[in-house]
Amino acid sequence: MLGAAEVLASATFDADGVPSGHTPKADEGRFLLKILWLPDNVALAVDQIVGGGTSPLTAYFFWPREDAWETLKTELEDKAWITDNERVEVLNKATEVINYWQEEGKGKTLEEAKLKFPEVTFCGTA
């Protein structure tokens, strides 16, 4: 199974800079977990990989301000075209990131989080 980063890395761009290429099929890394890394919160969102680019699939859900994991789970379950394996893969990675942030990540920089989870897209101020 190709990961999201591998799919995006294989994308080609036309003369106008528009990504084109392979849209992954079910269980081929069709989704990209995005994390907003902040000092007092971590937010999670999912993008779908389409035609070599990405398209937002969910809004950002904040932890611990709200139960981001449960909200993300509900959002993914509401999309019947997402396979169980894909949903589990995204939620497992979200669990890893939340646990890391809770246990040791609050004191870690954004760059340290990126190194810990290279397959996840990060942005933020921490």
From Swiss-Prot:
Gene3D superfamilies: 3.30.390.140. The keyword Ligase does not apply. GO terms for molecular function: structural constituent of ribosome. This is Probable small ribosomal subunit protein cS23. Keywords: Ribonucleoprotein, Ribosomal protein. Part of the 30S ribosomal subunit. Pfam families: PSRP-3_Ycf65. The keyword Ribosomal protein applies. Probably a ribosomal protein or a ribosome-associated protein. Belongs to the chloroplast-specific ribosomal protein cS23 family. Transmembrane segments: none annotated. GO terms for biological process: translation. InterPro entries: PSRP-3/Ycf65_sf (IPR038447), Ribosomal_PSRP3/Ycf65 (IPR006924). GO terms for cellular component: ribonucleoprotein complex; ribosome.
